[in-house]
């Protein structure tokens, strides 16, 4: 008998069943990586552009003369403005508006406040005084002394 761990026969690992996985999407190259310079020279590029305009016009009109249609559209809708020369100063994006006029005074002489002491308050305000009973805005020293004496 062998009681040592080293002498025991090792059991094999239990294989796990494979998990279903979603296939990876194919790698799509970016558009900037697929661009290459044109293979035509300048007259060939101009010819291809003219034919593309002619065929796009033929997609909605059967007259075959897209140049006259472009001229009619330009006359009817207005031509685009001419480009500014390079290095010209940029015009201001938003023009400054003049200040708004002062609002009209809707109540030049407001009536007195309705309620108790309203008539006196209105008269006091008109005479340069403040307060609900037409008196002074700030209490005098005598009023404060009387108030503190009543508190004691």
Swiss-Prot record:
Compositional bias of kind Acidic residues: 133-152
Compositional bias of kind Pro residues: 15-26, 80-92
Annotated region (Disordered), positions in chain: 1-28, 75-152
Residue ranges, compositional bias (Basic residues): 1-13
Protein name, per record: Uncharacterized ORF2 protein
